[in-house]
């Protein structure tokens, strides 16, 4: 029998919220009887924006802003129907983007 696998990718700007969400997902999956691989930390994506401080001139005076996107990967091996139902009902913070592949 081929093993079923659900791959969950999490993205967030704050690492605390993504770690808390990953812990909730792992705890729910283990409680319902699925094997869990992860959470695996993926490379953090850094986006840097450079802007002029002055609206018209002084090109030498610039300011840089940075946006970091933290990512985690969780694999659920052989999930039961109960696992899928519990993950659907799970309440996660608003700042976490979830991508699920079956």
UniProtKB/Swiss-Prot annotation:
Q: What is this protein called?
A: Small ribosomal subunit protein uS10
InterPro entries according to UniProt = Ribosomal_uS10, Ribosomal_uS10_CS, Ribosomal_uS10_dom, Ribosomal_uS10_dom_sf
Work out whether the entry's keyword set contains Cell inner membrane.
Answer: no
Pfam families hit by this protein = Ribosomal_S10
Q: Which family does it belong to?
A: Belongs to the universal ribosomal protein uS10 family.
Q: Which GO CC annotations does the UniProt entry carry?
A: ribonucleoprotein complex; ribosome
Q: Which GO terms of the molecular function aspect are on file? A: structural constituent of ribosome; tRNA binding
Q: Which HAMAP family match?
A: Ribosomal_uS10
């Amino acid at each position: 029998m081929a093993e079923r696998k659900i791959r969950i990718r999490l993205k967030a700007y704050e690492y605390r919220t993504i770690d808390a969400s990953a812990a909730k997902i792992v705890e729910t999956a283990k409680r319902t009887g699925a094997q869990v691989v992860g959470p695996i930390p993926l490379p953090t994506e850094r986006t840097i924006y450079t802007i002029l401080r002055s609206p018209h001139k002084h090109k030498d005076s610039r300011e840089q802003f940075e946006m970091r996107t933290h990512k985690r990967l969780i694999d659920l091996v052989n999930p039961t129907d109960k696992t899928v139902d519990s993950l659907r009902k799970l309440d996660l913070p608003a700042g976490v983007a979830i991508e699920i592949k079956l």
